[in-house]
Amino acid sequence: MLLCTARLVGLQLLISCCWAFACHSTESSPDFTLPGDYLLAGLFPLHSGCLQVRHRPEVTLCDRSCSFNEHGYHLFQAMRLGVEEINNSTALLPNITLGYQLYDVCSDSANVYATLRVLSLPGQHHIELQGDLLHYSPTVLAVIGPDSTNRAATTAALLSPFLVPMISYAASSETLSVKRQYPSFLRTIPNDKYQVETMVLLLQKFGWTWISLVGSSDDYGQLGVQALENQATGQGICIAFKDIMPFSAQVGDERMQCLMRHLAQAGATVVVVFSSRQLARVFFESVVLTNLTGKVWVASEAWALSRHITGVPGIQRIGMVLGVAIQKRAVPGLKAFEEAYARADKKAPRPCHKGSWCSSNQLCRECQAFMAHTMPKLKAFSMSSAYNAYRAVYAVAHGLHQLLGCASGACSRGRVYPWQLLEQIHKVHFLLHKDTVAFNDNRDPLSSYNIIAWDWNGPKWTFTVLGSSTWSPVQLNINETKIQWHGKDNQVPKSVCSSDCLEGHQRVVTGFHHCCFECVPCGAGTFLNKSDLYRCQPCGKEEWAPEGSQTCFPRTVVFLALREHTSWVLLAANTLLLLLLLGTAGLFAWHLDTPVVRSAGGRLCFLMLGSLAAGSGSLYGFFGEPTRPACLLRQALFALGFTIFLSCLTVRSFQLIIIFKFSTKVPTFYHAWVQNHGAGLFVMISSAAQLLICLTWLVVWTPLPAREYQRFPHLVMLECTETNSLGFILAFLYNGLLSISAFACSYLGKDLPENYNEAKCVTFSLLFNFVSWIAFFTTASVYDGKYLPAANMMAGLSSLSSGFGGYFLPKCYVILCRPDLNSTEHFQASIQDYTRRCGST
């Protein structure tokens, strides 16, 4: 507040000097003032293009040094029409007359001058600064205008300490909605915040992620470009090139040539131009001069429908122009009002006499010279802007209507302070020619944008409304069938740094922009989530994905199920073996006292058959989903059972060698072996050693059910962990040593009596056992699939079958098929024959 006060004190001196200067040498037009019960101010750019540099602290004389601005003229007339309609209305502000003071704000100095004029006390040449501004009554109650963001910010800052309502028809910058800085600012044009969001949605809709961005150097352009860059990059859009055109930019100068070169080199098909009309004209004249064609130009509302831009010679060759435009609205009767003004007899400008209250910028000689056939044409862009000025006047009138209590049909005529009117204007909500006029909490209008495309019919320009943008939130509605693209087959132009990757390919950024990338397929076991296109994510433990996948699939859980044909075959074979073992045990029990059974070991055969049955029973643990009991028992029980069988086989062969070869040669050893029950002791010790190995194995390297994920990317293997342990290896090495011992003993007994000579059968069974396990371990080294347990079971079944077949089947054959060989006489004859052979040698 102190800063504003200090500025106003300094400006008070300036305004006194300026008025003194103006009143000596200027004139004013009666069209700029209208007396009334309550006055409004209108700030309009009736002139523009004031290029001279001031060397003295003087206000620009718009009528003398600037060119006529047709657009500003239509705004000027829209306010005059609005006030006239309100004064003629019996419903709105009955028995109250509105007056106005209109100013030509062709330059910043003219704008400051006009603002200070409306802030001054009625009939005074100064602004009275006092501690309490609550009861300060300036010349006007409200201000309509000015046109640009820069000038609106200046005016709003000066009006803010006094809370004089200011309704701008053209200042769209988002910063003006900050009420801490501009508490009395309202507007009838949409906030640039929504324009920027609309542009981003437009870019996203057509997949344009690689764009160039150009703005003007005023607040409108710079703030708009900055906001658009922030929002666009936040939505994954990359800015290939960005530049701001200076106020001094001219067609063909080095600055614009450099800008054109960079635009061409950037390679972006889409260029967003967020600029004022004046610099947009310079820009597109440079584009035409450089022959920069084949692009899509996205226009901000300031120039999207401006004839000032469409009139650039050769602009129809530059490519496609899409734009965001203020929703097309017409001021009813404005054209007729302007025509009537052109036909009317104008009063001559009155001179400013010393001490009078007039201004050099309340004069428009061109306006007074208009005839019906020379008056400016009312075009779409000017009509939309004029409507914003028109409804700003009505918003003030409705606020004053409520403040004066006019709802009863008659208005009170008490003193009104600007801050009181500001509160009422913020609350207005009414229909104006079927258009709702109201303000949100930021005092922005409830409005919308049109999305337009330029059309050319030869040299004639027109535009097509493609859709609209509404808020909040911002939503874009476009009828794409109305768009005629300037490319092959009416296809949407592409504006990307890199084309989209194939499904399942991640983007690897090259350079500084995330829109520029290479496509690399996701590795096996990873997938590309659409939420992050730049990083392949790993699948879950129970999932898998092939290379280049955008989703994960559940892994297939595999194990040797009972329902499989392989399982049926193995199950039948193992069951058959068990039945044979059981049948053999019964057969041997029935013929226990026969020579064949006694020579096979007698009761020791039942231990051998039982151990084989235990090993066979353990094989059932390989079927179905692995469980803890199955994992604990299946390999250990098999190893222990086969150890007992091999121990019995070894000791049986060794015992025959002792009887027939060492009983006479080494009688002491023979008697010690028999008296100390060497056979049973050997079997017990050998089995105990294997039992110790197995117990250590089960305790230290406990076999447990496990889910294996590494071998196959798409499978989960259910297995036991026994084959990965040292205990498993030790147990099978121990059985290997026993097999070698049994083989050696059998080989040493190859020349025993025929009925006791089992070398051939035992050798065959042991060799088959070796081959079976060598085949299994070879298979396991190259194959890790679901049928590995089946291979393991087959090796075990082969070992058991070879042991049973090599040792017991020949004896079963003699018992069942050759009972003549199962006699004491036959065995005695065989022993006698062996004795004769040994004696002869």
Curated annotation (Swiss-Prot):
This chain's function reads: Putative taste receptor. TAS1R1/TAS1R3 responds to the umami taste stimulus (the taste of monosodium glutamate). Sequence differences within and between species can significantly influence the selectivity and specificity of taste responses.
Q: What is this protein called?
A: Taste receptor type 1 member 1
Q: Where does the secretion signal sit in this chain?
A: 1-20
Which subcellular locations apply to this protein?
Answer: Cell membrane
Q: What is the lineage of its organism?
A: Eukaryota, Metazoa, Chordata, Craniata, Vertebrata
Q: Which proteins does it associate with, and in what oligomeric form?
A: Forms heterodimers with TAS1R3.
Q: Which residues lie on this side of the membrane: Extracellular?
A: 21-567, 625-639, 702-725, 783-795
Q: Where are the transmembrane segments?
A: 568-588, 604-624, 640-660, 681-701, 726-746, 762-782, 796-816
Organism listed in the record:
Homo sapiens
Q: Which GO terms describe its molecular function?
A: G protein-coupled receptor activity; taste receptor activity
GO cellular component labels:
membrane; plasma membrane
Record's bilayer topology term: Multi-pass membrane protein
Q: What InterPro entries does this protein's entry cite? A: ANF_lig-bd_rcpt (IPR001828), GPCR_3 (IPR000337), GPCR_3_9-Cys_dom (IPR011500), GPCR_3_9-Cys_sf (IPR038550), GPCR_3_C (IPR017978), GPCR_3_Ca_sens_rcpt-rel (IPR000068), GPCR_3_CS (IPR017979), Peripla_BP_I (IPR028082)
Does Transmembrane helix count among this protein's keywords?
A: yes
Sites of glycosylation? Answer: 87-88, 95, 291, 479, 529
What residue ranges lie in the Cytoplasmic compartment?
A: 589-603, 661-680, 747-761, 817-841
Family as reported in the entry's similarity comment: Belongs to the G-protein coupled receptor 3 family. TAS1R subfamily.
Pfam families in the record: 7tm_3, ANF_receptor, NCD3G
Protein keywords: Cell membrane, G-protein coupled receptor, Glycoprotein, Membrane, Receptor, Sensory transduction, Signal, Taste, Transducer, Transmembrane, Transmembrane helix
Biological process per Gene Ontology, one example term = sensory perception of umami taste
CDD domains recorded: PBP1_taste_receptor
Where does the source fall among the domains of life? Eukaryota
The protein's matches in Gene3D superfamilies, at most eight in alphabetical order, are given as: 3.40.50.2300, GPCR, family 3, nine cysteines domain
